[in-house]
C-alpha cells in the first residue's frame, strides 16, 4: 500500500522515513534539543549535559548532523582555536517538533514528568506563544 502511494506521487521514499533516518540516531535529538532550548554551541557543553554520550559518539553525531545540513561547524580564530556549532534553517525547524514532543509527554506521561503525577497543559507549564529557548535560558 505504501509503495503504491509513493509510486503514485513520484516519490522515491517515504518523507517520514527520511526524517526519521535524519534524526533517529541515538543522541541526535538530544543535541538538537540542547542547541534549540539551551542555546548550547560547543562540544564540551554537549558532552557535559547529555547523559551517556561519549566523545566518540558526540563527534560522529555532530559530523552526521553537519552532513545532513542541520548544523554548521564554525572555527573561531582564537588561541586556542575554538569550534562552535550553529543551527541551519533546516535545524531550526525542529523547535516546533520538540515542542510537540514536550506536549505529548506533559499530557500523556505526567507520572514520569511531574512529581505529583498530575497531567497539565503544556502551555500552562511553559507559557503561551513563548519560544522554548526563553524558558531554558540561564
Describe the role of every protein-language-model region.
Residues 66-86:
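Beta-hairpin "wing" of winged helix-turn-helix
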Residues 44, 63, 83:
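Residues within the helices of the helix-turn-helix
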Residues 58, 62-65:
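Basic amphipathic alpha-helical segments that dock to polyanions
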Amino acid at each position: 500500500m505504501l509503495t503504491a502511494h509513493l509510486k503514485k506521487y513520484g516519490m522515491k521514499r517515504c518523507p517520514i522515513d527520511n526524517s526519521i533516518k535524519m534524526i533517529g540516531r541515538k543522541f541526535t535529538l538530544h543535541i538538537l534539543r540542547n542547541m534549540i532550548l539551551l542555546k548550547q554551541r560547543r562540544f564540551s557543553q554537549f558532552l557535559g549535559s547529555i547523559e551517556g554520550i561519549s566523545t566518540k559518539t558526540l563527534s560522529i553525531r555532530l559530523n552526521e548532523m553537519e552532513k545532513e545540513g542541520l548544523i554548521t561547524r564554525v572555527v573561531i580564530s582564537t588561541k586556542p582555536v575554538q569550534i562552535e556549532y550553529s543551527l541551519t534553517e533546516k535545524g531550526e525547524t525542529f523547535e516546533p517538533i520538540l515542542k510537540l514532543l514536550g506536549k505529548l509527554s506533559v499530557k500523556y506521561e505526567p507520572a514520569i514528568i511531574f512529581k505529583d503525577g498530575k497531567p497539565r497543559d503544556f502551555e500552562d507549564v511553559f507559557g503561551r506563544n513563548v519560544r522554548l529557548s526563553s524558558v531554558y535560558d540561564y
